[in-house]
């Protein structure tokens, strides 16, 4: 449920640069033709693969066809560091909205080992959503030999 158009625009640019897909779950805090969304994504929108799903169940059903994926929920309360996960191609990385993160009912669908956190200093609430996605995507890509990078 992204709320801030520039964050999603930045993630669109990230997905274009890493050949990853972006799946957004409604409700969105903006329209997909939002000026700030387009501005943040610059001219990368045409290179990004973006899908919008009505809810998390629909997203999960769409991505688990034809073969189920491994799913990881990114949360500040996760038990597993992003640097301890062994990512494989096709893994799904799930992030919450900017103001409140993933809802508890979504987090509860993930085994404790699949609840992932990005290490931060104590007493700091969270990273910016776009930055958190970048940290996770680049770590997963690095572990897979930056396949497709120049």
Task: Indicate where each model-derived feature is located.
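Post-transcriptional modification and biogenesis factors for structured RNAs
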Residues: 1-150
């Amino acid at each position: 449920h992204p709320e801030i158009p520039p964050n999603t625009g930045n993630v669109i640019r990230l997905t274009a640069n890493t050949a990853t897909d972006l799946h957004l779950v409604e409700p969105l805090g903006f329209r997909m033709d939002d000026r700030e969304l387009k501005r943040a994504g610059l001219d990368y929108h045409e290179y990004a693969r973006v899908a919008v799903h009505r809810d998390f169940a629909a997203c999960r059903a769409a991505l688990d066809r034809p073969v189920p994926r491994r799913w990881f929920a990114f949360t500040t309360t996760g038990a597993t560091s992003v640097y301890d996960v062994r990512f494989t191609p096709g893994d799904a990385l799930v992030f919450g909205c900017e103001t409140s993160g993933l809802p508890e009912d979504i987090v509860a669908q993930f085994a404790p080992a699949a609840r992932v956190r990005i290490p931060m200093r104590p007493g700091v609430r969270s990273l910016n959503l776009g930055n958190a996605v970048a940290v996770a995507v680049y770590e997963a890509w690095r572990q897979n030999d930056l396949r497709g990078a120049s």
